[in-house]
Amino acid sequence: MALDQGAKVFGVDIAASPAPLANHPNYKFLKADLCDKQTPKDVVQACVKMFGGRIDGLLNIAGIMDSNQSVDSVSDEMWDRCIAVNLTAPIRLMREVIAIMREQKSGNIVNVASKAATSGAVSGVAYTASKHGLVGATKNVAWRFKHDNIRCNAVCPGGVVGTGVHNEMDIQKWDKEAMKTMFLIHQSHSCDKDKGIGLRAEDIARPLLFLVSDRSKGINGAILPIDNAWSTI
């Protein structure tokens, strides 16, 4: 969608690049693990080199779910992984781009948080804590660098149809007792999918592109729900 609007895009993921984008002249890709301490620096340096020295926007989209484990059942492995991917990696990427954005006296950052970033009743403790942390970091960056003409906002999507996230998870490892306490909350949102009004990836992408563009000038430190009113409960 960003490419369709004329943007130059540098993508990074632990998975391979989408095949349809491979030959696009304005798209570059680095296959890497964002949890590696060196990766954020490598990503930003490569982006600057390939696209003429500027970085106008950063979209922190990468993230992982937990298994809805509560504080009494979460493993160290799950906790560390969620914090590393959902919180530490985006902070490191922001740290790297801030220097460039301050020098060019402009820049827009958008972090993808979650409904779990503003609630304690929709996910496990690791995912919830990581997304709450990302919202806090978003507000801190927005306030700290507003005089440098740098904006930082976050979006909080609800469930997204067609992502296949839950299909990739081992249901046997889920905290079933915790899931029972969340059932009605999840049910109140999943009915949107049943009625054909569930959100799709493009419904999240459009607000992301708005916030990372100059069309959203003045919007800074905002936490935007994209969940068809799920955030009202």
From Swiss-Prot:
Pathway it works in: Secondary metabolite biosynthesis; terpenoid biosynthesis
Keyword NADP among UniProt keywords: yes
EC number: 1.1.1.-
GO biological process: terpenoid biosynthetic process
Annotated binding of NADP(+), by residue: D33, R95, Y127, K131, V160
Deletion consequences: Impairs the synthesis of terretonin.
Family affiliation: Belongs to the short-chain dehydrogenases/reductases (SDR) family.
Name of the protein in question: Short chain dehydrogenase trt9
